[in-house]
Amino acid sequence: MIQVLLVTICLVVFPYQGSSIILESGKVNDYEVVYPQKIPVLPKSKIQRREQKMYEDTMKYEFKVNGEPVVLHLERNKELFSKDYTETHYSPDGREITTSPPVEDHCYYHGYIQSDIDSTAILNACNGLKGYFRHHGEAYHIEPLKFSDSEAHAVYKYENIEKEDETPKICGVKHSTWESDEPIEKISQKKDFLEEKKYLELYIVADYVMFRKYGRNVTTIRMRVFDMVNYITVVYKALNIHVALIGFEIWSLKDKFVINASTKNNLLHFSIWRSTVLRKRNDNAQLLTGVDLNGYTLGSAYLKAMCDVLQSVGIVQDYSKSPYLVGAAMAHEIGHNLGMEHDTKTCSCMRGNCIMSPEEEGSDFPMEFSSCSLYDFQNYMLTDTPQCLINKPSNTSIIKNAVCGNYVEEEGEECDCGSPEQCENNCCEAATCKLKPGAKCAKGACCKKCQFKKAGAECRAARNECDLPEFCIGQSAECPMDRFHKNGHSCQNDQGYCFRGYCPTLAKQCITLWGSDAKVAPDECFQNNTNGNEYDYCKKTNNVIIPCKPTDVKCGRLYCTGGTENPSEGEKISSDPCKASYSEIEDIGMVDHRTKCGEKMVCSDGKCIPL
């Protein structure tokens, strides 16, 4: 009996290669036990003199995979957080509690495998090594074996994780036919903008379901979010975009609005919350939800909306145990904000899956953007030039020591155009990162030939009749913050009212859904919305259908006439002159928020209310 017991204990403590095991990522059907050995990076004398930190800036580990030695080089991601990073949660009595925790000495790393030029590593060293690395074209996970007192780790291929759900997850963003109508000569003047280093200050919110899902443990959720952002920073480096987490918020008491299965409604309400309630300045905000979204949808975002006061947002479902898969979904939605459409069959990536694939593909983590995505991104940058991306964060809030010559304008620098051999900026002294004598600026929408443009020079044209142009002030290289007409300003020949820089109208929505020849249907068609059936209603809450009141009928299902035979989204459910669209997966075909529904009246949450 004693002999049997000893054998059992040995099997538990020292798992063998090829067995199944339950790990944090799920059930793994084939894995290998490794014992990472730390290799000193600096000579002992330097290690002793070095400032004492809990986590080192650079580390090196060696272990074997399939009998082959692997040397893992790691460097701490010093650009993960902004200097003014904050965290917010809520007390039981409803008080908002915001702190500025120390995050400089964190445990999140990027790296590579020695002698493997195409390798990548994204992991944390908070308690052992945990994360993802790519070696010889294969995707691997590594994580500590919790039930072992030794340094044992499990290494396994991503493909060997037993899938939680075999059904492919899809993105809720629909294809658009947007094309630039700017003249080539005007676009060519914006090439400098495309080449500039860009900063994306990201704010992430975890909803109340997330809080409950992870046992109300704030530390567990924040570590998961940090893993996601660590992944996102890697993939966006390829676009010369530095992503820094500027704030993280947990709705630990209750959600700030009703979050349900409809990504369209959630996205709208989150965008309104961000623009009217959230006080922390940010370039983009993402809502991480534990709610199961409609159908197989894993997220959604507004297309070409980066820096927009209202629409620079996305929503992502926490659909997988792997933080990197959820991080990939968030990187995908941010890509939509940056103008990228879904990849088609003609798009491809050199290393496996592409980030902008319309559905999650289970064979590997996406690590790069396709040529199609790069084309979309470049077009969007050249036509829309989202200014928040080149606004240097306050105090260059990236946590790292300034390095002259890295193209990043950091604290203490007036400019940074690369090394003296690489610099092509006539206003910047490359060796010192200072402006040349007589120069007042080196770049910016209000900088020309090293001088500030005169006050009154237009630096950002109005996008539409609800937007306002911006003009240089004569004392700065930066274009002033984007402004627009006040809400309620009449637009589109009195067909609508401006709302945060946009003019939502029934006519425009019909054209989007049914093509350029479509028009708004006769008023009697909208009376169907009083029926309160599967298709005709004003609001659906938790699958409960609420019919429209007679005064609210133009705030329910959208009815159009003419145009194409089938809609661009959803399925046709009725014919001319009362054409409508419907989809079970998404709440498609409903009248948009703030659309005009009467004189001085607009739609809001399925009701026609006064401005």
Curated annotation (Swiss-Prot):
Keywords: Cell adhesion impairing toxin, Disulfide bond, Fibrinogenolytic toxin, Glycoprotein, Hemorrhagic toxin, Hemostasis impairing toxin, Hydrolase, Metal-binding, Metalloprotease, Platelet aggregation inhibiting toxin, Protease, Secreted, Signal, Toxin, Zinc, Zymogen. Residues 198-393 form the Peptidase M12B domain. Binds 1 zinc ion per subunit. One of its GO terms (molecular function) is zinc ion binding. Inhibited by EDTA, but not by PMSF. Its main location: secreted. GO terms for biological process: proteolysis; venom-mediated fibrinogenolysis in another organism; venom-mediated hemorrhage in another organism; venom-mediated suppression of platelet aggregation. GO terms for cellular component: extracellular region; host extracellular space; plasma membrane. Residues 401-487 form the Disintegrin domain. Coiled coil: none annotated. It holds the Pfam family Reprolysin. It is found in: Secreted. Expressed by the venom gland. A motif (D/ECD-tripeptide) lies at residues 465-467. InterPro entries: ADAM_Cys-rich, Disintegrin_CS, Disintegrin_dom, Disintegrin_dom_sf, MetalloPept_cat_dom_sf, Peptidase_M12B, Peptidase_M12B_N, Reprolysin_adamalysin. Snake venom zinc metalloproteinase that has hemorrhagic activity. Inhibits ADP-, TMVA- and stejnulxin-induced platelet aggregation in a dose-dependent manner (on washed platelet, but not on platelet rich plasm). Also specifically degrades alpha-chain of fibrinogen (FGA). Negative results: does not affect beta- (FGB) and gamma-chain (FGG) of fibrinogen. Does not interfere with ristocetin-, thrombin-, and collagen-induced platelet aggregation. This is Zinc metalloproteinase-disintegrin-like ohanin. It comes from Ophiophagus hannah.
